[in-house]
């Protein structure tokens, strides 16, 4: 990995224009890590553009840099290097996949060990969040980590550790959090503006999803839905993050919970599970993935069919892991 980091540093030094990519249906880690890298590269005097298949809005906008996503047109020839941040597979680049793969100076910075090495140079380290890896790289680059870098990295770290509650949380997570705090991370703002802030419309829609959840008391799992009709009824943007809603049912004694979000481009599934249950195995059946206790995928079918397929795979997984 040291060789690849040296290659990254050399490419950054020689580049003038750099494109950074977050994965589709972004989570706090891919957004926070990308924004932190943007601010660091800007300190190097680089011109940096941000790209994401999915519109970045909602609570992410407390990081004002997110307003720059997809403002520029991505033409490979216009950029000296391209970097995918927290992107496990090239499919997660969405419409940018083909052009990214064509670029001869591409990098992937990620913490998903089981991902695809789709970039020309892959920098992958197993750690609780991609934000940790970005932190290490920036320290190696001797970049001064100030509030503009520390705050988005803290967002990313909180996101992938479930605010320091999930199985991926370890001593390193707290060590990095401490260092980011010392560097000026605005912790209160991350909690208030991202994790705690909700509109009345979102509260009403989440209440509806929770009240109408289907539960299986034999297999101990719950299925929640966010229908296209309800997105419209409650005036909630499709890109509003409801991925952690299933956690409510885990606290009620269920081992696996999933929310199926009916959007224009398909059914987006967000799986959550208790520590002993690996939902990445289920998500992978549909071409998705992620972490053991938090994974996702997308199905190109109706909500009814998606629910049927997901329930089938959850039961298959639970049956095969009964002992």
Q: Residues of each region from the PLM?
A:
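Generic enzyme active-site microenvironment
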Residues: 21, 25, 84, 108-109, ...
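Hydrophobic helix-and-loop "lid/oligomerization" segment in the mid-to-C-terminal part
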Residues: 2-24, 30-61, 71, 76-79, ...
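Short, motif-level signal for alpha-helix interfacial/capping segments enriched in acidic residues
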Residues: 2-7, 88-89, 138-140
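Active-site cofactor/cluster-binding pocket
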Residues: 64-120
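Short alpha-helices
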Residues: 109-176
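An acidic intrinsically disordered interaction segment
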Residues: 1-6, 98-106, 126-134
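Conserved beta-strand scaffold positions in the cores of enzyme catalytic domains, especially
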Residues: 106-108, 121-124, 221-223, 259
């Amino acid at each position: 990995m040291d060789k690849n980091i040296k290659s990254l540093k050399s490419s950054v030094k020689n580049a003038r224009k750099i494109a950074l990519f977050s994965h589709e249906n972004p989570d706090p880690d891919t957004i926070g890590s990308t924004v932190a890298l943007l601010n660091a590269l800007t300190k190097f005097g680089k011109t940096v553009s941000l790209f994401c298949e999915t519109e970045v809005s909602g609570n992410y906008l407390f990081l004002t840099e997110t307003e720059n996503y997809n403002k520029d047109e991505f033409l490979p020839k216009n950029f000296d290097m391209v970097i995918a941040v927290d992107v496990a597979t090239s499919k997660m680049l969405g419409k940018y996949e083909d052009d990214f793969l064509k670029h001869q100076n591409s990098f992937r910075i990620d913490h998903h060990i089981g991902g695809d090495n789709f970039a020309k140079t892959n920098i992958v380290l197993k750690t609780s969040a991609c934000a940790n890896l970005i932190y290490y790289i920036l320290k190696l680059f001797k970049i001064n980590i100030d509030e503009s870098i520390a705050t988005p990295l803290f967002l990313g770290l909180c996101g992938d550790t479930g605010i320091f509650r999930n199985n991926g949380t370890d001593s390193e997570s707290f060590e990095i959090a401490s260092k980011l705090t010392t560097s000026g991370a605005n912790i209160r703002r991350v909690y208030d503006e991202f994790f705690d802030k909700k509109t009345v419309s979102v509260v009403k829609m989440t209440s509806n999803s929770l009240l109408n959840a289907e539960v299986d008391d034999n297999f101990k799992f719950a299925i929640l839905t966010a229908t296209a009709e309800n997105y419209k009824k409650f005036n909630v943007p499709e890109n509003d993050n409801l991925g952690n809603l299933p956690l409510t049912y885990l606290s009620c004694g269920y081992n696996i919970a999933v929310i199926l979000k009916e959007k224009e481009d398909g059914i987006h599934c967000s799986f959550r599970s208790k520590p002993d249950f690996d939902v990445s195995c289920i998500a992978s059946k549909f071409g998705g993935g992620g972490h053991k206790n938090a994974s996702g995928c997308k199905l190109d079918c109706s909500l009814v069919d998606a629910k049927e397929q997901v329930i089938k795979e959850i039961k298959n997984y639970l049956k095969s892991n009964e002992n």
